[in-house]
Every structure is written in C-alpha cells, then in structure tokens.
Amino acid sequence: MNNHVSSTPSTMKLKQTINPILLYFIHFIISLYTILTYIPFYFLCESKQEKPNQIKAKPVSSKPDSAYRSINSVDGLASVLYPGCDTLDKVFMYAKNKFKNKRLLGTREILNEEDEIQPNGKIFKKVILGHYNWLSYEDVFIRALDFGNGLQMLGQKPKANIAIFCETRAEWMIAAQACFMYNFQLVTLYATLGGPAIVHGLNETEVTNIITSKELLQTKLKDIVSLVPRLRHIITVDGKPPTWSEFPKGVIVHTMAAVQALGVKANVEKKAHSKPLPSDIAVIMYTSGSTGIPKGVMISHSNIIASITGMARRIPRLGEEDVYIGYLPLAHVLELSAELVCLSHGCRIGYSSPQTLADQSSKIKKGSKGDTSVLKPTLMAAVPEIMDRIYKNVMNKVNEMSAFQRNLFILAYNYKMEQISKGCSTPLCDRFVFRNVRRLLGGNIRLLLCGGAPLSATTQRFMNICFCCPVGQGYGLTESTGAGTITEVWDYNTGRVGAPLVCCEIKLKNWEEGGYFNTDKPHPRGEILIGGQNVTMGYYKNEAKTKTDFFEDENGQRWLCTGDIGEFDPDGCLKIIDRKKDLVKLQAGEYVSLGKVEAALKNLPLIDNICAYANSYHSYVIGFVVPNQKELTELARTKGFKGTWEELCNSSEMENEVLKVLSEAAISASLEKFEIPLKIRLSPDPWTPETGLVTDAFKLKRKELKTHYQADIERMYGRK
C-alpha cells in the first residue's frame, strides 16, 4: 500500500471563494510585499532552498544491497551519547550532575473536580488545574534512589522482572530510573490493554511486583490479580485504594511513598546495589502482534542509548531552554525515547494527558486552561491521529468564519505554502494570521515529532504552515528501539520519513513475491532492514519469532527485518511504499490482522470471497466483497430492492445491508470493534486467477486488489 505520497504545493492549496476584484487587489498587495522583501531575504532564501536537496544519506558501497548511512556516520555508527555513559543509570547521573538544580519533571495540581451533566444525561468529569509543580534533577535522582532501595527491601532482585502498568506521569519516569539504577528489568504494559493481555504479560515475565495507579488498580487489575499467582506486591504511585474483600491473600498493597520511606532506611544502612552492564536488559516492552497476544521485546541499556543518541542528533539546539510535553503512553517506545532524550539534555518535561492537553480537551472545565496553554512547550511528540484531529478542528473553525476572514486565511495559507517551497519565511502571516492557531499548542512549539504511523502529506503541510514549525516525521519500530529515520527540520518535503539516524544503517532486501528489487529504476526498492546498536535483543521467551525477524551478519552486527517495503530517494531519504505483512497499524495505533478479519467472515453464506483492507492514515477497516449471487438476490428481495445483478452490487443500500450481516458475524466471532469493516464495496465479478486478483491457489493478491479497487478505496475513506 502506498502509505506515503509526495505532494506538491499546488495540489494542497485551499480553494478561494472571494470577489475577483478584491482578490486581484489582495494579490497585488501580496506581490508588492514579496518584491519589497525579496532582496533582503534573497541570499538566505537561496541557501534554504538548496538545503532540502542536499545528500542526507548514501550507500556505503556500490553493491545494490548496500546499506545506506547518514552522511554524518558513513565511517562508523554512533552508539554513545556521552563518553563513558554506556548504561542508562550513568546517563542520568551525568545529567543530574550537569543540571542538578534545574527543573526536570512537572505535574499540574488538581484544584477542583466536578461532575458535569451532558444534554444526553451522561456525566463527564471536569477538572480545574493549577500551575505546574516541578521536581529538579536532584529531586528525581533522590526519589529514584530511595524507591529502588525500597524495592530491594521488598525482595526485588537484580536482573529480575518488575512490571509497570500506569498512565504517563512523573512517577512512571521516577520508577523507571530506579529500575535502571538497580538493574531491575522493567516490564512495560499499555494502560489500555485488556485483561487477558495483561495477565499474559505478567505471567510470561513471572513478575512478583507491579507498579500501578490507584485508578488502574481498581478498574483493571482488581479483577485479574487472582490470575497472576506469583504476584506479591502492588505499589500504587498516588495513594492507597480502598481494600476489597476478594483481594487474594499473600498480595500486599503499598504506596510509592511508603516504599521510598523503606528506601531511606536502606540508605542509612548503606545497603549496596547491583549496577547494570550495557548488555543487560533495561526494558521488556510489550507490543501487539497479529494474533492479538502481545509480544515482549527485550531492549538492552545499549539499545536505548544508541537510539536516543541517534534521535538527539536530529534535533537542533536541544537544551535547557526546551520544554517537552509528555502525554503519549510511556509504555510506547516513541514516548519513552523522546523523554529520555529530553532528560539527558537538560530539558523540562511537563506531564499531560489527551483529556487535558488543550483548552478544549474533554476533561478541562470551560473557561480554564489546558496543559499546553500553561506549559507552553517547545517540543511535542504526536501520533498522526492527533494531528489529523487538530487539522479537522481548525478547518471546521475556518469554514465557520465570515467569507472575508475565511478567504484571508486561505490566501495566507496558500501564500505561505509557496514561500515554504522556496525555503522562505513569512513573519507577517505568522504574526497576524496563524498566531491564534499556534496558541492551540501553547504558542512556543518549535518542533513537532510525529511517529507511530504514517502522516498524510496534507496534515503535515497544514502543521508546517499553521503552527509555524517543522514536523519531524520518523520511522522506527519497538524492535529497533524506535530508531530508524527522522526527517531533517529544514526538509519540508512531504511523503518521506527522512534519512537513517547516525546510530543505524538501512538496506533494502529484494522481495520477489511483491515485485520489489534493490535494482529497481529509477530508485531502489525492497524490504527495509535496520542494522545497528539500536536493534533489540529479540522477543522474550519466543526464540522462533526472534529467529524469523532478527539476524546477525558476518561482522556480528544485528539486523531487523521490518516487513515494510521502502524506497530510497536520490538524496538518501526513505519512503514507505508498501507492507510485506498483512498486519496493519491503524491511525490510532491498533494493529489489525487482515487475514484474521477475512477468516472470521469469508465462510458466511452471503460471502463468496472477501479482502479486508486498512490504511495507516485512517482509523477503520474497509473491505472488498464478492457476494454469493443467490444469497444477495434473496436478501434484496426481502428488503424490497429490485434491479440487475450489477445494479444490486452497485447499490449503497445493499452495501449497508451486507455490512449489517458482516458486523453481526464479526461480533459473534469476537472481533474487536476496530477490526470490523466499517465500509465495503460489493463486486459483481468473481475473483479468478484469470483476473489477476488471486493466485492459482486462489490466494489473495493484495497489491493487485488495491490497484483494482483504488477508486473505491478513495470513496470509502474520502479525500481530505
């Protein structure tokens, strides 16, 4: 699937609906302004325009399967952020000594909490929040040291697993730093996981201790604790919950403060602790798989340090003046890596949540301030779904403007798009037109980092223009510790994920079945392989899957086979153009196994054949269906629809009726809500080997089916 499509400025311009005479006058003013500012900015603009076309990565040899490296690491890959700091505890010690009394972790105080009754009768919790309260580097270090000591007192052993199942907050990072210091292997689980997945992760890793929050203990863990027989200690980061009678014997609940108090006592007794080695496991990060059972990725200290080294080198002027807003799940490699990059460079990290991020967020009481308005971050990571939501909300506001205001916005938008393509800035547009949009994220954002799924060219360009900052689109996997590529801040091209980071190299492997070869012209194509110190140790207790996805070359370098298909542009930047596997990550981050969806539905009497399709730019699954002629004709008769076979298949009413049947079957088959096709296309023609849509063995040819139904895909997903 073509996840990344390069778009020129002309194809993304907004349409104007303004009186032609007034339009000519405004264009005259803009032209006059451009001429007057052209000469002073000429040399600066020219250099900026040339910069995006510079070579950013190149192959290390002339062979077709040669790896590409950043031009800054052709002679050797980077693996250490600071000399001598080869484990995460040493990195934090270095940062603590350098930025000792500087603010590090910030949390907003809850001033008031209210229940607000909605028109439909539902009750929403609304909060009024105060200012950020900050912990310094020294504060965090002492709390982590005491907490680690306290965990030792509870029986936690070095190189033994300990789980964290908690929302993104300062206590999460403090607990993680404690584990890194004391060489406890931190098992991370998403706070959104369902009961069976949580039980699987806890039992597979044989944890005896788990760190969580009061809310998650009451809403998620309470019902499954009895299914985790080795569990002995539960540590809540925000106070002790009420006891319940069904709580299993032998399991003790502690508060984080109480465990830290134990640690203070241990400090007085000078109890020594084990130090990690670079090769030791730092994190076992659970990630979704095609079967729905999460897999634990083993990530060493050296993996994480190499990854954050590569990421940090792609962020210019990173330092003490920067403020990062943390709200994505810390159990996700993108957020954990981003926060560790900030922590190691003296940046402040202020915590938030998707429900309190902006003034208009769902939990913020009307009239009070969201987190971005108070924190005013300079750096922010986001997944495409959040950026798409911002794009849609702003454009809805634009459409509600008066005709004059709307057209002024559109003129400024299109003008800035043209200037960006030339490498020029637009200070007047930024100041007078886009200032209010920029304030949605606090007004100080200088870099947005996007990862987790592909970002559409339209949304990327919108964020560039309206928030007056670059969008660094990255590509990486949990298995590569999140590191792979990130676009340069001065590269405003869309549809690409940038050049390899200095910590890794990337090569393309032929995929004959898909028709992708590293000898393809005009650009090499193939399966993306990532090599470097950031490539992880493999899957926990899953040697077979590890051997499938990882290998070591003759030089001892570890490589990851991603299953994604890429293409290198002449300047060394990577595009993601297809996916080898039928596992697709939706825009919100859920993984959908297309084969699983098809298997659940293809045996229905109404269905002769089905192909599920999902695109990472969107949040739902669609499908192409060859209906059984007899069953569909009968369904049409019972619903009162008439017409020829082709007319029935092309009828939107019949599509909806078939969709109802599919949805019921999907629920019966226990498919998740996000796995159920939301829209379908009925095909009047069967898929045979002669059509080229299936193999001789009648296996689906996904690439050909996508091409065949491209117009229907665009219809079902709609255009931006």
From Swiss-Prot:
<dbReference type="GO" id="GO:0005524">
    <property type="term" value="F:ATP binding"/>
</dbReference>
<keyword id="KW-0276">Fatty acid metabolism</keyword>
<keyword id="KW-0547">Nucleotide-binding</keyword>
<keyword id="KW-0735">Signal-anchor</keyword>
<keyword id="KW-0472">Membrane</keyword>
<keyword id="KW-1133">Transmembrane helix</keyword>
<dbReference type="GO" id="GO:0048471">
    <property type="term" value="C:perinuclear region of cytoplasm"/>
</dbReference>
<protein>
    <recommendedName>
        <fullName>Fatty acid CoA ligase Acsl3</fullName>
        <ecNumber>6.2.1.15</ecNumber>
        <ecNumber>6.2.1.3</ecNumber>
        <ecNumber>6.2.1.2</ecNumber>
    </recommendedName>
</protein>
<dbReference type="GO" id="GO:0031956">
    <property type="term" value="F:medium-chain fatty acid-CoA ligase activity"/>
</dbReference>
<dbReference type="GO" id="GO:0004467">
    <property type="term" value="F:long-chain fatty acid-CoA ligase activity"/>
</dbReference>
<keyword id="KW-0436">Ligase</keyword>
<dbReference type="GO" id="GO:0051047">
    <property type="term" value="P:positive regulation of secretion"/>
</dbReference>
<dbReference type="InterPro" id="IPR020845">
    <property type="entry name" value="AMP-binding_CS"/>
</dbReference>
<dbReference type="GO" id="GO:2001247">
    <property type="term" value="P:positive regulation of phosphatidylcholine biosynthetic process"/>
</dbReference>
<dbReference type="GO" id="GO:0042998">
    <property type="term" value="P:positive regulation of Golgi to plasma membrane protein transport"/>
</dbReference>
<keyword id="KW-1000">Mitochondrion outer membrane</keyword>
<comment type="similarity">
    <text>Belongs to the ATP-dependent AMP-binding enzyme family.</text>
</comment>
<keyword id="KW-0812">Transmembrane</keyword>
<keyword id="KW-0256">Endoplasmic reticulum</keyword>
<dbReference type="GO" id="GO:0005789">
    <property type="term" value="C:endoplasmic reticulum membrane"/>
</dbReference>
<dbReference type="GO" id="GO:0019901">
    <property type="term" value="F:protein kinase binding"/>
</dbReference>
<feature type="modified residue" description="Phosphoserine">
    <location>
        <position position="683"/>
    </location>
</feature>
<dbReference type="InterPro" id="IPR000873">
    <property type="entry name" value="AMP-dep_synth/lig_dom"/>
</dbReference>
<keyword id="KW-0067">ATP-binding</keyword>
<comment type="function">
    <text>Acyl-CoA synthetases (ACSL) activates long-chain fatty acids for both synthesis of cellular lipids, and degradation via beta-oxidation. ACSL3 is required for the incorporation of fatty acids into phosphatidylcholine, the major phospholipid located on the surface of VLDL (very low density lipoproteins). Has mainly an anabolic role in energy metabolism. Mediates hepatic lipogenesis. Preferentially uses myristate, laurate, arachidonate and eicosapentaenoate as substrates. Both isoforms exhibit the same level of activity.</text>
</comment>
<dbReference type="GO" id="GO:0005741">
    <property type="term" value="C:mitochondrial outer membrane"/>
</dbReference>
<feature type="topological domain" description="Cytoplasmic">
    <location>
        <begin position="42"/>
        <end position="720"/>
    </location>
</feature>
<keyword id="KW-0576">Peroxisome</keyword>
<dbReference type="GO" id="GO:0005794">
    <property type="term" value="C:Golgi apparatus"/>
</dbReference>
<keyword id="KW-0460">Magnesium</keyword>
<dbReference type="GO" id="GO:0001676">
    <property type="term" value="P:long-chain fatty acid metabolic process"/>
</dbReference>
<keyword id="KW-0443">Lipid metabolism</keyword>
<dbReference type="GO" id="GO:0044539">
    <property type="term" value="P:long-chain fatty acid import into cell"/>
</dbReference>
<dbReference type="GO" id="GO:0047676">
    <property type="term" value="F:arachidonate-CoA ligase activity"/>
</dbReference>
<feature type="transmembrane region" description="Helical; Signal-anchor for type III membrane protein">
    <location>
        <begin position="21"/>
        <end position="41"/>
    </location>
</feature>
<keyword id="KW-0492">Microsome</keyword>
<dbReference type="Pfam" id="PF00501">
    <property type="entry name" value="AMP-binding"/>
</dbReference>
<dbReference type="GO" id="GO:0034379">
    <property type="term" value="P:very-low-density lipoprotein particle assembly"/>
</dbReference>
<dbReference type="GO" id="GO:0005778">
    <property type="term" value="C:peroxisomal membrane"/>
</dbReference>
<keyword id="KW-0496">Mitochondrion</keyword>
<dbReference type="GO" id="GO:0019904">
    <property type="term" value="F:protein domain specific binding"/>
</dbReference>
<dbReference type="GO" id="GO:0005811">
    <property type="term" value="C:lipid droplet"/>
</dbReference>
